[in-house]
Amino acid sequence: SISEVFKQVRTLGQPGDLLIIFSNGTSPSNLVQAIQTAHDRSMFVIGFTGAGDTDLSALLSGEDIEIRVDHHDPHRISEIQLLSLFCLCELIDQQLFGGTP
């Protein structure tokens, strides 16, 4: 179940892997556990967070990346996170396959 997503990280995650999390500002406990588990497995974390995610932010290490939407409306946070994800995918595509946007 989604409340136990950290179990998948513990089972499948390998050192050097990347965990990407999305939170709309509510710092759900399953994501807290997933980040802790990822760090226990020597994984990196990219956290797409909202203004209320101070618990998640505190867990991120110096090697992790936080892309924070400084807003309190969960719908607006999700919308901006989705746009950010599309931009990130476009940049990765350009790095892998070249070309111009």
What are these regions, as identified by a protein language model?
Residues S1-G98:
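Glycine-rich phosphate-binding loops that contact phosphosugars or nucleotide phosphates
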